[in-house]
Amino acid sequence: MVAQPLRRFDTLTDEERAFLCTFPDDTERSPWMVGKDFHRLAIEVLYYPLRRYRADWYVSSDLPILYPRPNNRLGQVAPDILVALVHNHLRDAFDVRVERGFPPFVLEVVSDESRPRDTGKTKKVRIYDLLGAQEYVIFDPRAKRRPSLSGYRRTAAGSWEEWPLDQQGKLQSAVLGLTLAQEDMLLRVEDAAGHRLPTIDEETEELDTLRAELARLRGERS
């Protein structure tokens, strides 16, 4: 799951180059970057299990990804979750020139403010295609009818296609080797055996239970 090389500018059409040059950056002042409590909770439920799952993964949230534009300026996108197999150290930004490619897995938790940008085929769907993502997950917990899970993925031939849910309504990630499953208005991660990866709250609760049981056993022996 190494960073994916960017497409060479000379392989792009004039329209694609123009799109890369003019796509608005994700910045702290962008109205679609405003996070509300529920939006942050949905991200936290994903971030901690993914970061704990493998020590050789680099997992981050809302980190700027810097990429070169055809006009020699830098562009910036900041997915809610990114995963890449690069050196796991703290970063101020994920610079694709330094990392030699784009993160293969990106995920957006949609908010009311970000919905047009995150789901639009002429916006985030397209920029992640042109930048070389292998998988893009879109989770919309507050869609009009019900929570919505969808995505796009890279085929073996290199094309960018809609990512179908399996028969259980889940996404099987080839990049992560994990399954993404809706649970009410949250998105959870499952391993190959179907076991849900615990959140930090669940791990803390389990640890507290074990400590209480240990204290009880010690009390019975005294």
Regions found by a protein language model. Give the residues of each.
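Gly/Pro/Ser/Thr-rich low-complexity, intrinsically disordered segments predominantly at protein N-termini
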Residues: M1-E135, F139-S222
